[in-house]
């Protein structure tokens, strides 16, 4: 798997590495120079921001499927749900906490849907974990 580093001499983990939930050792980059969402985080391309703090960015989807449609992302580059580690839990928890507050502020007062597409089968288009928040005044239809 790309990004995994081997054990150092004596079987210990190498300096500067992170052990994930499964005991794997990874070196995760803060941002990916080719990732469109990382470019939005860095301010290299515009995004219609909804919210921003040191860990999380929320911005409107450029192809909305409902009157309220925005995405929440961790600022740290994590390609997909498969790549999340325990170290990512605070940012992901913040994302889930913000989803309802921001949805309500943007007009989804009677409910909304959260969607996380993961991998090829899940039709993930951008390889940076993101949560879509979709809502509006009318029911969204069945899943």
Give residue spans per PLM region.
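HIT superfamily nucleotide-processing domains
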Residues: 4, 13-14, 18-143
């Amino acid at each position: 798997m790309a990004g995994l580093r081997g054990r150092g001499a004596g079987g210990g983990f190498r300096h500067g590495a992170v052990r994930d939930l499964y005991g794997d050792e990874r070196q995760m980059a803060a941002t990916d120079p080719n990732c469109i969402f990382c470019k939005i985080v860095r301010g290299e391309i515009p995004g219609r921001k909804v919210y921003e703090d040191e860990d999380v960015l929320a911005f409107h989807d450029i192809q909305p499927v409902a009157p309220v449609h925005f995405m929440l992302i961790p600022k740290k580059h994590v390609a997909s749900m498969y790549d999340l580690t325990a170290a990512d839990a605070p940012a992901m928890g913040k994302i889930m906490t913000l989803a309802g507050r921001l949805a309500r502020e943007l007009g989804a007062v009677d409910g909304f849907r959260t969607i996380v597409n993961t991998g090829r089968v899940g039709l993930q288009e951008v390889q940076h974990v993101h949560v879509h928040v979709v809502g509006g005044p009318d029911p969204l239809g069945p899943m």
